[in-house]
Amino acid sequence: MNTTEILNAIKAEVAILETEHAKTSKAARGRARSAANSIKKLAADFKKTSTTEDKA
């Protein structure tokens, strides 16, 4: 994955987070937390990939 693909994945997860956060059920809150964790992992991947691309 390159940084553009990772950024698009982060944007998709943010959209899910916003949608699920607006809901009131426990399941929706769980999905929101899951999306937040995915964003965290993607951000780490973005930093690694960005550094690699800068070196190339």
Regions inferred by a protein language model and the residue ranges of each:
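Short intrinsically disordered terminal tails
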Residues: 1, 55-56
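N-terminal acidic leader/helix
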Residues: 1-22
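Short, charge-rich amphipathic interface segments used for partner binding and complex assembly
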Residues: 26-55
